A protein has these predicted regions:
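Core SAM-dependent methyltransferase catalytic element
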Residues: 304-314
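A short glycine-rich, Lys/Arg-flanked "PGG" loop and its adjoining helix->strand segment in the class I
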Residues: 169-182
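Rossmann-like AdoMet
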Residues: 1-80, 86-132, 140, 150-151, ...
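A short His-aromatic
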Residues: 164-165
Length: 314
């Protein structure tokens, strides 16, 4: 049995998907919801050409022992927000356990399929685990993640450029609010490299992943075009946004379920899709500081394109 509790039901997700599509939006969570999307995501992660996943994973692998040394033997709850399939988390969980830390793992995600993988991976490694299906940026779900009086010290993980999938300035503050004195946050971000950053998204491998939720509702490659764009976010120097949208080249109908319900996109209409923020290093650290966090450790990937920081309340 794989223990997963749900604050967010599949029916709620289905209703939210239809509402978002009507508003011509396809939020981040739906790129990991459909079975086809999950399959495309796992294929993307398993291909070494997807450098962003590999940068984050290798940085965790290289730093896991050092990071684990920040925690004394004893109980520790590892709360992973946007855990996905949990494979990067598991590297750190094992390093903590090897140092005598009694880890309990609480992965949080909106994807039932990926959450099951995260929990199963931890259980197979002998680590206590309980999944929570939730949207951690919903205020009610965020409140439910607050520590109880009996909750042991916590390490909160927000890795894989997860802050960048939302508004990182707001998300960093929301996540920081979960920390008590003595709790720590491990977060990372992709560092901006101009055209090379955009090329990391606008390529056949990533396009397959981006197309997956559209394919799941009957929209095909010939129905329109995926467009990737980059712009600066002027709230901070060195804060950059990679966005994408689908532009219909002809009238298309998206299938909203087995009952024949469809939603039409007219030729020329746009469907806004998920985005990803990138940073210069000083801007990423400034965002953490603005959320009331003090960085205690930082590391970068071998190619200097990913920055990871361990921080606590200032």
């Amino acid at each position: 049995m794989i223990p997963v509790q749900a604050l967010l039901t599949e029916n709620e997700l289905a209703d939210e998907f239809v509402s978002a599509f009507r508003a011509r939006r396809l939020p981040e969570k739906f790129f990991y919801w459909f079975p086809l999307s999950v399959r495309a995501w796992l294929a993307l992660c398993s291909d070494g050409a997807y450098r962003n996943f590999e940068r984050s994973r290798s940085l965790i692998a290289r730093s896991a022992g050092e990071l684990a040394g920040s925690f004394p033997p004893g109980p520790l709850e590892v709360l992973s927000l946007g855990a996905g399939q949990g494979d990067k988390d598991l590297i750190l969980l094992r390093a903590l356990a090897q140092r005598g830390v009694r880890v309990s793992y609480l992965p949080v995600d909106t994807s039932q399929a990926l959450l099951e993988m995260a929990v199963r991976g931890a259980l197979d490694a002998g680590i206590a685990a309980q999944g929570l299906k939730a949207d951690f940026l919903r205020p009610d779900h965020l409140a439910a993640l607050a520590a109880e009086p009996e909750t042991p010290p916590r390490l909160v993980l927000v890795i894989g450029n997860t802050l960048g999938a939302f508004d990182p300035v707001i998300a960093a503050c929301d996540v920081a609010a979960l920390l008590r004195p003595g709790d720590l946050l491990l977060a990372d971000g992709e560092l901006y490299a101009g055209d090379a950053t955009l090329a990391g998204y606008d390529n056949p491998l990533n396009r397959r992943f981006a197309w997956a939720p559209l394919h799941a509702v009957g929209i095909r490659d010939g129905d329109g075009e995926l467009v990737f764009e980059t712009r600066d976010d002027h709230r901070f120097p060195g804060l950059h946004l990679i966005s994408k949208h689908f532009r219909a080249d002809r009238d298309v109908e998206a299938l909203m379920g087995g009952g024949g319900e469809t939603l039409r996109l007219a030729a020329g209409e746009r469907l806004a899709m998920s985005h990803s923020y990138k940073y210069v290093a000083s801007t990423f650290l400034r965002i953490l500081a603005g959320a009331g966090l003090a960085v205690r450790w930082q590391g970068t990937s071998d190619d200097g394109r990913f920055l990871m920081a361990l921080a606590g309340r200032a």
